[in-house]
């Protein structure tokens, strides 16, 4: 499911999307397996991005989707690497996903977004209405 977020959307917005859109969608749809297309180009420090995720944000999101898979489809989940144009961000993000998937290790990178995140509440509510949540 794609959710159109404005430039600068980061950890707060993505976590709200996970909680307020992805969770109800999965609970309603009842998938047999979850596929996640992971693009690390949404990292705030990616050279071509206008989004604002941090590595900690990727870890939080990955943990949430792993939990959804455990709750709704016997833990069946596949992560597929898509994009990311800064090698350090890709490595740190992939490590975060691995930690979330295996439950082993701790993320070392601490790279909070230094920019102010826009309020995305109205966009999230709009998408919820589109999907009847």
Which residues fall in each region the model found?
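A general "terminal functional-core" signal
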Residues: 1-133
